């Protein structure tokens, strides 16, 4: 079709320039929402008396026909983008009246509207997938409230904890992600439609009507801002980066735990791969892929922040670069959440190996220090005493539970027989009953709270 902007020009763009400027290869993803936006715009034009009834009926029928044949459409780079491609297809169906659809509308507010609509659909789908992941985490946690494992700092064994407590830490990370996405929807559910190229329009349009038809909750009060704003995209990319960071941290732990050196978890065959050379291998490839894809999602955020950092108002062609990054991020984070959900749901935690790991370390050292405090010794002094006891064990090739009472009393005479039950890792975990702690009762309370959060939806 003739370029929408062709009247000003005396020669066509070169084929190379045309291909370089075209976005149809990726923005065709917006086809369905573009038609949705056009239907709302056309209905508003009719209700405002800008379109005749017969014109509205023709345009509506044509757009709905395009909706039913969406998968069959053939797009061309000659028509640059999804908007011009769909206008060409509509013109082929209903004739010149299709040109009236663009009354009081620019591609600037049109593409912004499309992006708002598309992102709303995606964010809702991502929220649903995150909730499913959280549900799976609570199911695994429920089975492992009293499964004891080493807790780590600096990847060194620190204190014994409940496996459920560890799993639920990620539940709350994803809960914050869900909160951020829900808040992001407030900015996504704003309508730029009717802002025109930048300055509004002389036609008596009703922007609130078209917003209502599209399910938007607000209308941009400034037309310049409406077509220039991509904050909602940047905000989403930042949230998606945080989701991927949380997934990547969890994946890192799974990769470590699945190694023979730890052997804390067994991933199902459905979420593992082998080696083309080494027949014994069972690799956590999908956890590694999620960890690796996190970097690309970060790159999309930084890339688009850099694109937007020096753009004057209003629209600039640079902003065409918003789509590939956000589409790639959306696909990546959604797939990652869904793959990770299946991986966790089908994983088997090796409870005996986890418990055994707590029996052969010094993660009960804090229990000994706390015991001394209950005997009236200041914590800093108790810390020093226990440090010397640990050093003695390291030099002697034993653990705190192996020391005799007479040996303990060389470090301090207040230590008595009642110390030994406290050194048991299961008892050590059970006793940590403070709110949010790893004690079994506290973890059950936390699990109930997590389930309550999911029931709110």
Swiss-Prot record:
PROSITE patterns: FUMARATE_LYASES (PS00163). The keyword Cytoplasm applies. It catalyses: 2-(N(omega)-L-arginino)succinate = fumarate + L-arginine. Its main location: cytoplasm. One of its GO terms (molecular function) is argininosuccinate lyase activity. Belongs to the lyase 1 family. Argininosuccinate lyase subfamily. PANTHER family: ARGININOSUCCINATE LYASE (PTHR43814:SF1). This is Argininosuccinate lyase.
